[in-house]
């Protein structure tokens, strides 16, 4: 194993807020990048005040800002803009998720940043992109869910009622798309003869269209006539109630013998009604499946299907997922004692590289925790920092 993580030495300036940008920056920190998070004085990141908290630190903020240093700078003041520009001049990556053009208001216009620091990867998240009739519209996760098909695909087939996905998938999908783009841009910079950086843009709209397209849009990709009516399996899969909980069983589109034997109905595998499962018979077959599962406990259901090598899983409440035996065996949800919040759980990075370690940082910064240290690194004297704090430029 090498002695340092993949992005050791890469400096990231994070002037984003809430979820999409901060999560992307944290993922880079997990890969070893040095990340500085910027918040305006007296305007903490929204996530600092949302959800469960202890001693002033919320789990939401911790889950999106581990491993960063935090400074508090007023980018609306000229001297604050000068500080941000100095940080951008020293950065390898800048991440912002403001509406198009708004970053100029804090002195971080992309063209000017790249003119001063040609090696910079200037990474922007926006709602609909920088061109088009909706490019300046305000956007949040649930709006993007609505316009990219995520809400529609949640629609109940029986009632026709559409529904949201009750977390923020559109933001998180965009975060991961931005990290992909940033890593590619850093690699491209290494190959460029002059080591030049570039602007990188990810719109929430396009990131989530790309996310939906491979499977959820399989019936809406071919333009014009198709060979015959197809089926989108995702519309038919169910959650099955047990005596004491619920399970999910898959697949239903492949060989059925194992499923039929698991529910003690082997004859169904040869039943003419179910020789090919499609829109005409899937509901009927699943009704039979549901009838048997409803007579079993969750443990009995898992045992019956596992015995016949049928993929099955229990519906686990969120407050119990850290106790899943696989999560415990792999250390997927480690616990740490972290100031000021105390004992806290977090999901480890999704990747495992045999020769390059990831960093699961154990701390998230308090508001402006590293302002003085970072300004000192820029060359500011203690009395200059005190003067800036006195006029509200920093905190």
Model-found features: residue ranges?
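N-terminal helix-loop segment corresponding to the beta1-alpha1 unit
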Residues: 1-192, 288, 366, 372-395
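Terminal low-complexity tails and localization/encapsulation signals of metabolic enzymes
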Residues: 1-11, 241, 320-395
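Short, well-structured beta-strand/strand-turn elements
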Residues: 35, 306-320, 381-386
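Glycine-rich beta-alpha junction loops
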Residues: 42, 128-129, 204-209, 244-246, ...
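Conserved Rossmann-fold dehydrogenase catalytic segment
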Residues: 130, 159-169, 190-208, 226-232, ...
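Oxidoreductase and adenylate-handling cofactor-binding alpha/beta cores
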Residues: 175-198, 214-220, 260-267
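Active-site-adjacent elements of ketosynthase-type condensing enzymes
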Residues: 209-228
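Aromatic-enriched alpha-helical interface/lid elements that frame and gate functional surfaces
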Residues: 235-308, 312
């Amino acid at each position: 194993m090498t002695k340092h993580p993949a992005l050791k030495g890469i400096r990231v300036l994070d002037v984003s807020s809430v979820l999409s940008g901060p999560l992307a920056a944290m993922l880079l920190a997990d890969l070893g990048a040095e990340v500085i998070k910027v918040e305006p004085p007296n305007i903490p990141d929204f996530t600092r005040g949302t959800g469960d908290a202890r001693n002033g630190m919320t789990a939401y903020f911790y889950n999106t800002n581990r491993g960063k240093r935090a400074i508090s700078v007023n980018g609306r003041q000229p001297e604050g803009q000068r500080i941000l520009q100095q940080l951008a001049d020293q950065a390898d990556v800048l991440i912002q998720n403001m509406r198009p053009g708004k970053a100029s208001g804090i002195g971080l216009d992309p063209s000017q940043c790249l003119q001063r620091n040609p090696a910079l990867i200037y990474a922007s998240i926006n709602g609909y992109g920088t061109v088009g009739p909706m490019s300046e519209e305000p956007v949040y996760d649930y709006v993007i869910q609505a316009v990219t098909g995520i809400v529609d695909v949640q629609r109940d087939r029986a009632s026709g009622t559409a529904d949201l996905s009750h977390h923020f998938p559109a933001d998180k999908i965009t975060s991961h798309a931005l990290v992909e783009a940033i890593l590619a841009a850093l690699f491209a910079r290494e190959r460029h003869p002059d080591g030049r950086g570039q602007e990188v843009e990810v719109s929430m709209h396009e990131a989530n269209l790309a996310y939906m397209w491979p499977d959820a849009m399989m019936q809406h990709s071919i333009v014009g006539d198709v060979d015959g009516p197809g089926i989108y399996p995702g519309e038919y899969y169910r959650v099955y109630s047990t005596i004491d909980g619920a399970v999910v069983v898959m697949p239903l589109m492949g060989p059925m013998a194992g499923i039929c034997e698991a529910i003690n109905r082997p004859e169904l595998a040869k039943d003419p009604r179910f020789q090919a499962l499609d829109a005409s018979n899937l509901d009927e077959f699943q009704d039979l499946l549901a009838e048997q599962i409803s007579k079993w406990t969750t443990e009995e259901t898992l045992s019956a299907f596992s015995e016949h090598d049928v993929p099955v899983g229990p519906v686990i409440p969120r407050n119990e997922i850290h106790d899943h035996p696989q999560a415990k065996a792999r250390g997927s949800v480690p616990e740490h004692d972290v100031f000021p919040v105390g004992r806290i759980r977090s999901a480890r990075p999704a990747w495992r590289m045999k020769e390059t370690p990831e960093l699961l940082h154990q701390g998230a910064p308090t508001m402006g925790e590293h302002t003085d240290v970072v300004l000192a690194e820029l060359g500011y004297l203690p009395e200059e920092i005190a003067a800036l704090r006195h006029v509200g430029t920093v905190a």
